[in-house]
């Protein structure tokens, strides 16, 4: 897909296109924690259970040491009673883990199905970008056939570009190391050290309908401001007003206390990526018009600094 932006007419749009692509990935990531929880509950319900993030680790530890007594056994017994279990604790631990394992299989099946759909879309629309689906050798062959001169990089130019790539790779590797460790650590921290209930305004962050409305409202606001067509402005303004009304309705219908599963904290990062994408696109677009847009490596560096501050 990146080859589409090798065309000089579109080269300046490459970073904006990537922002939109990355935003689309994060739309899925925003809904993934709730979807995973729903799949787990659907599978567990078959055996009369519901998902509780505190059970899997305790159940596995208990199965490793079934003769254990004391705090661990007491905690597991309390959790088992909350699930409506009145039998042997060891049987509960085994039954719960086996039932939960089925949800992992189901989750993997959903991911596989998504890949099949993605591949079908790729094949179905391949004709629309067939001209860009070529290798460097194929591009060179086409240019030679047209009698165009193929410019080859000198050894020094190649060395400079490889050095630049290695430097970017180093930065990106450390970024993703911190990114993924942060996500896993955040889930564990949420499980062990945060409240499992939200009250007041914090409930908004655990309500997907409200978060969805906020995102749509943000895009409607930008469309209202940036659009030059009166009809588009009116439609965007109407959508914005509708989202505000829906947010109010959803908020007034929230329970006084919202139960939180630890994995739901994972939806915050993609939510803010999706929410702030139009701001970043507008910012860099404005800088590009003034000829002041930073290069891609500089943007990566700024991202690393922001991540470090976080």
Predicted feature residues:
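Structural signature of the two symmetry-related core transmembrane helices
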Residues: 275, 295-310
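A gly/Pro-rich, aromatic-decorated transmembrane alpha-helix motif that marks the paired
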Residues: 27-42, 309
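Hydrophobic/aromatic positions within or immediately flanking transmembrane alpha-helices
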Residues: 105-109, 266, 300
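Intracellular loop-helix junctions on the cytosolic face of multi-pass helical membrane proteins
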Residues: 6-11, 15, 37-257, 280, ...
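Hydrophobic/aromatic residues within the transmembrane alpha-helices of Major Facilitator Superfamily
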Residues: 27, 173-177, 271, 309
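Transmembrane alpha-helical cores of Major Facilitator Superfamily
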Residues: 19-27, 267, 271, 305
